[in-house]
Structures are given as structure tokens and as C-alpha cells.
UniProtKB/Swiss-Prot annotation:
Residues bearing the modification N6-methyllysine: K5, K15, K19, K24, K28, K37, K80
Name used for this protein in its record: Histone H3
Modified residues (N6,N6,N6-trimethyllysine): K5, K10, K28, K37, K80
Function: Core component of nucleosome. Nucleosomes wrap and compact DNA into chromatin, limiting DNA accessibility to the cellular machineries which require DNA as a template. Histones thereby play a central role in transcription regulation, DNA repair, DNA replication and chromosomal stability. DNA accessibility is regulated via a complex set of post-translational modifications of histones, also called histone code, and nucleosome remodeling.
Subunit structure: The nucleosome is a histone octamer containing two molecules each of H2A, H2B, H3 and H4 assembled in one H3-H4 heterotetramer and two H2A-H2B heterodimers. The octamer wraps approximately 147 bp of DNA.
A GO CC term assigned to this protein in UniProt: nucleosome
One biological process term in Gene Ontology: rRNA transcription
Pfam families (UniProt xref): Histone (PF00125)
UniProt region (Disordered), positions on chain: 1-43
Organism of this sequence: Neurospora crassa (strain ATCC 24698 / 74-OR23-1A / CBS 708.71 / DSM 1257 / FGSC 987)
Amino acid sequence: MARTKQTARKSTGGKAPRKQLASKAARKSAPSTGGVKKPHRYKPGTVALREIRRYQKSTELLIRKLPFQRLVREIAQDFKSDLRFQSSAIGALQESVESYLVSLFEDTNLCAIHAKRVTIQSKDIQLARRLRGERN
């Protein structure tokens, strides 16, 4: 067969349809009996934004009560052993700790946005604490 020169043609923008092999065509046309339906997945970030809106609306505590109570008791033992706490005292501590952390993360997020980032980093937390006057 003689070689012929190919001429340039305008592209239509899509791939040309391929011919399927007989075995692949048979597999596609046959109904799948044991096929498992793929679970629905949201785009990345959609669920995160939904959670942000949900937690901004809510007023309930975000840290579980018992793990927080154990942490408070563990820290208090370094200062004095056999300390007892009223449940309302631990509740008040938890309220104030969560309020502090939420406001710190808000300031940290502003620092990340100022640096033209969307991800907070440890240097953002350090800057937020320094601007607040908490850092040595």
C-alpha cells in the first residue's frame, strides 16, 4: 500500500467513538443482577460548609462532657490531689473553654484569610494569640 500525505483538518472538539468489542458489548447490554449501587457523594467542601452553618446556629456544647471532665480532673491533680468538683463548676469551665476556643478559631481563620489561604495553620494560631496579648 502506498503512503499518502495527510492533510490538516479542523477538529470537531470531541473524541471519535470507538468500536466496542463483542464481549464488552455483551457485558454492557446484560442487566447486572448483583450490582451494588454506588453511594451518593457530595462535592468536596459541601458537607464542611453544611457543618459550619449547623454548628454556628447551635448552642449546645461541642466537646463531650465525660472526656472533658476527665481532662479537668487530670490537670487539677497536678496542683492538688483529691480535689472535688461540683457538676455546675465543670459545666461552667466547659462553657468558657468552648467559648474561648471558638473565638480563637475565628481569629485564626481571619489570619489565614489575610495570608490569602483557606486552610488554618499553627502560625495563624500563634499570630492570633500574639495579637490578643496572650503570648509571652
